[in-house]
Swiss-Prot record:
NCBIfam families recorded: PRK02565.1
Single GO cellular component term: plasma membrane-derived thylakoid membrane
Keyword tags: Membrane, Photosynthesis, Photosystem II, Reaction center, Thylakoid, Transmembrane, Transmembrane helix
Subcellular location(s) of the protein: Cellular thylakoid membrane
Organism field: Prochlorococcus marinus (strain NATL2A)
InterPro entries in alphabetical order: PSII_PsbJ, PSII_PsbJ_sf
Family to which the UniProt record says this protein belongs: Belongs to the PsbJ family.
Lineage: Bacteria, Bacillati, Cyanobacteriota, Cyanophyceae, Synechococcales
Transmembrane regions listed in the UniProt entry: 35-55
Name of the protein in its database record: Photosystem II reaction center protein J
Amino acid sequence: MSKLKGPDGRAGDRLPNGMPAVSWERRWTEGALPLWLVATAGGTAVIFVLGIFFYGSYTGIGNAG
């Protein structure tokens, strides 16, 4: 077992010399797509769908006029 691993088997955040174990560039882009990009696309999609519902409430079958 490596000295760098914690009791739960995961690697620590810092090396023994105090340097970060993972560079900040890789820490935010480890997955296939960066999380900020997925969150931005998801948030935009939610706002778009809500906009469609609000538009539909003012026009079409559900309008008061």
